Amino acid sequence: MKKILVITTGGTIAMKKDRETGGLMPAVSGKDLAAAVPGLAHYADVDVLEFSNKPSGWMTAADMFELSKLIDRLADTDQADGFVITHGTDTLEETAFFLEAVLKTEKPVCVTGAMRGASDLSADGPANILAAVRTAASGESIGKGVTVCLGDRIYAAWDVTKVHTTNPDTFRDLHYGSIGTVYGSRVEYGRIPVKHKKIHTDRIEEDIWIITCWSGMDGGIVYGAEGKAAGLVIDGIGCGNVPPKCRKAVLYLREKGMPIVLTTRVPSGSVEEEYSYEGSALSMKDSGIILGCLLYTSDAADDR
């Protein structure tokens, strides 16, 4: 039987309604999370490690980096054949992407969470944990990279995003769809995710600003990053185009040596060198701006 280590970080999956406020608050330990999953021991030898217990909006790039180092360190031992990371859904895609970008291990790593708290009617956490454990324990998951599993769908960490604020069926790959499914008796993959270049580093930069463009935008916000941000992600319009006044500010900071990545605010599709007017993706590339291609804005920020 495969040994799966469940590493808990917090999020809605580990929350219950607070009697005084009526809102969800962190309340469930990692071990209690696993204990709430019926039949878990039938699929893997599961151990639990609590990394943190906080809302995912409180996760930082430093937290993600420490988590990645923990996974790689444990993967070099015989303590686990695979890993499940429980995480709040607000920033789950960012942590999953970060792990995919930096992890050295080829052992399965599956990230999951919940849209309903542990005390809510029809809480989805236990079923998602079970599906994620089965995914991490499957031999088919080896070499597939970091995956995200909720609602029995398996997604590639590089491409998945949250598309609804409250609906449990909230995660999607808007480009290609899911890569696999957890069925009653098996885990089945329909395609192999595209391999991307890994980033191996001993440090990361946290002071990255994300600025979204809009019609008629001036460069005030962009200029405000000077001396404060170590890098910028510009969330352009269309296939990666930038309004004229914003363009001027972006090029000013680029000339000052700031690394800048251009993405798009459009939910699906790629940054493309479609046009050649000033402010187009092509012109920005020619001025030293990095094109984000298919990266979501938050993913580009995590590629730090």
Give short role names for the model-derived ranges.
Residues 1-73, 248, 268:
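ATP/NTP phosphate-donor binding region
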Residues 7-8, 29, 36-37, 156-239:
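Accessory alpha-helical/coil subdomains and C-terminal extensions
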Residues 20-28, 91, 97-109, 125-131, ...:
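A glycine- and small-aliphatic-rich helix-loop capping segment at beta-alpha/alpha-beta transitions
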Residues 80-92, 228-239:
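Short acidic, glycine-rich surface-loop motifs adjacent to enzyme active sites
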Residues 85-106, 242-250:
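Short Gly/Thr/Asp-enriched flexible loops that form oxyanion-binding sites at enzyme active sites
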Residues 111-182:
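Internal gly/pro-rich beta-alpha loop/helix module
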Residues 215-294:
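Catalytic cores of soluble, metal-dependent hydrolases
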Residues 296-303:
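Conserved small/polar residues in nucleotide/adenosyl-binding loops
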